[in-house]
């Protein structure tokens, strides 16, 4: 049987030279993950809908001495297929690759019986998630 090591500490350079995209990076789990990834050496691409929030996370990462992050504002709620293609091209041009993605952006919508769920809200939730 394998021993469970609950005291594991990731090496400081665990993500050195990795390029990671974090959606929903402006606050909450996305913000915390982006900061921690950078602390472990990753170049983080901060993606979210609110540029001001992304800029704050950017500043926190730089102040902590992490690799210079990048900001990519995008609102999934209104994003089109062209927006996604443009994003892929821009990221490829700037970085040449992605080593990982944390798709953290999400929208819950209402907790209600399915048959009572508003179809427009359903579409909105599916677009973001």
Question: What are the roles of these predicted feature ranges?
Answer:
Residues 1-21:
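Flexible N-terminal pre-Rossmann segment of NAD(P)-dependent oxidoreductases
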Residues 23, 98-106, 129:
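Rossmann-fold scaffold of SDR-type NAD(P)-dependent oxidoreductases
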Residues 26-27:
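Conserved glycine-rich cofactor-binding loop
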Residues 42-56:
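Conserved glycine-rich Rossmann-like NAD(P)H-binding loop of the short-chain dehydrogenase/reductase
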Residues 77-94:
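Conserved Rossmann-fold cofactor-binding substructure of NAD(P)-dependent oxidoreductases
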Residues 79, 124-128:
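Glycine-rich NAD(P)-binding loop of the Rossmann-fold in SDR/ketoreductase-type enzymes
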Residues 87, 112-114, 118-124:
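Substrate-binding pocket helix/loop in short-chain dehydrogenase/reductase
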């Amino acid at each position: 049987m394998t021993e469970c090591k609950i005291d594991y500490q990731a090496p400081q350079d665990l993500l050195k030279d990795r390029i990671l995209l974090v959606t929903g990076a402006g606050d909450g789990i996305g913000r915390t993950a982006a900061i921690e990834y950078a602390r472990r050496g990753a170049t983080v691409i901060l993606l979210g809908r609110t540029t001001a929030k992304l800029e704050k996370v950017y500043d926190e990462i730089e102040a902590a001495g992490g690799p210079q992050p990048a900001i990519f504002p995008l609102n999934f709620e209104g994003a089109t297929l062209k927006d996604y293609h443009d994003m892929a091209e821009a990221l490829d041009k700037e970085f040449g690759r992605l080593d990982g993605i944390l798709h953290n952006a999400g929208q819950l919508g209402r907790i209600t019986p399915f048959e009572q769920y508003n179809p427009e809200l359903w579409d909105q939730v599916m677009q973001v998630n």
